[in-house]
Amino acid sequence: MKTLLLLALTAVITSSSLLVLTAATTETIPPVSTSGVIPVQKTMKAFSSESELLAYLSRVATSVQRRADEELQKSALSVSSVSAEPPAPAKAEAESVTNTQHAGVDEGGIVKVHGNHLVVLRRGRLFTVAIGDGALRPISSVDAYGPDIDPSGTWYDEMLVADNTVVVIGYSYQRGGTEVGLFDINSEGRLGYRSTYHLRSNDYYSSRNYASRLIGNKLIFYAPEFLNDADFSRSFPAVRKWHKGATASEFQRIVPANRVYRPEINLDFTYVNTMHTVTVCDLANGGFDCQATSVIGPPGHVFYVSPDSVYVWASTWGRNEKNRSIVFRMPLDGSGPSALRVSGSPVDQFSFLQSEDEYLNVLVQSSGKGDGMWRAEVANGDVALLRIPIWSFSDGSDAAPSWSYRPLPKPAGYGFQNRFVGRYLIYGTGSGWGYPRENEAKWNLFLVDWARGSSHQLKLAHGVDRIEQMGSDAVIVGSDGKDLHFSAVRLRQWPEIVSRYTRKEASQGELRSHGFFYKPDGDDSGMLGLPISVPGRAGNKHLFENSAAILFLRNDSLQFREIGELGSQPERAIDDRCRASCVDWYGNARPLFLRGRVFALLGYEIVEGRLDDGRMHELRRVNYAPGQRS
């Protein structure tokens, strides 16, 4: 459970829609994306019948038990393949407030926009705040779960908005899997509960990744499920519509045998004990039509969604064994899944880039264990860049050739961060979820031109806690133990640090990628926002403490200038009588740039700022906490 894991983590760091089930077919799920097909050598094979699938699972169970008895583990990867009807085209006027990895692929978060309203998910409740016609006014609030649901043992983590549907994604230890709550929202910002569904899965939580994506009106989930040796049927992906008194027997399978795929490998190759599933649910017309595809493989996983494909990298970690892994690709155009045997493991979703030259680029570590729970925070090992053409994917029998791995310098320390920005892979280490450290000898920034192969190393005056794109360049954010630094990096043929801004006696208030936002207003200019807190604060404190303020910096040709901050007023906090999700797993502060206005989401406060003579001033604020309207 997250609660128990949280205690362990803290100790370590401190020291009415209808559910539609699709009948079995021999085809993959209809396409989500209408992008052109990138051909591969061959695709994976699905099972031809239920009996063939069960026989294979029995062999898997036997192999797993034998290997466990021998205390041997090996690595591999698995992925699922899923799609749905082509998504509705994005509205031209849509403006995102989420710092996503790829444009057009929304990610589950804590704040979204619906028409003239902000929609906020906070501590087990949904809220709307009117922003149309210059307003800033709370409108509606409801529990983020159904009226007949006991929210104890459930974490409501993410939220997405599609047309007039608000989707809340959580994980229920009590009801057994990913919990999806659907809510109606109208043009006046009024919220109303519609229905709840459960998708059978193990906990999807990652300290860095997000469990859901949204392309058009198609909701995409990834979820692992460990195989149950006693009853394999309890491991198959299934959906249940919730009602009072619902039982486990009401789960209905959404993956027939002929949409379960296996890599063409010997079972001795790896420790195979997990079913990895990608599910696509159609939210059009108020429905919840879910279809899924699964692949059987080892437990370690990292989930990445490009604009036209889903990738799952699954692996096993062993004591005295060479790392072996498999990466699976599921195109969103509806074509079949494919796989490739590989080595190592990515750190998180930002370790991936499907580039426009039709290559998959992945930073891998020799000792990586995926990004489930907090594994990304302790990632370590030798580093390499894997660069492989997408056409080389096949049925899992082929391996990426050794020359496709380029060994890279290994940075000292932990808190590993990586990201592809433009033509460069950028990585380094910082403080992560721990306390900021003073260690200048370890503060180096590594940059690799992934297409041309050149490498560069730059000396920093601080750690690498955040890597973000800023126009065609990058900004590196990190601490030196006392102050918070922003280094502007020009990404040309020879990368260089152009300038550095230092905010004295401050630290990052948020660690997740959604905590940052850069709003460009020219080719080389714009404004960035980032939550900040007191100096020396451990990264994990964002789970329990609010940020002090949102800091805003002006960028002009990679020269930073502070334009001010919008601060919280903790003295105005009230008891919200929290019943669910009382830990901020996804943080609680966001900079918001919307329709020429600037907001700071700070817990239960939304503060609006205005630029006067190049300085940020507070215009007004509203507290949208339950029972409070001011």
Tell what function each PLM region has.
Residues 21-630:
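Beta-sheet-rich non-transmembrane sensory/scaffold domains
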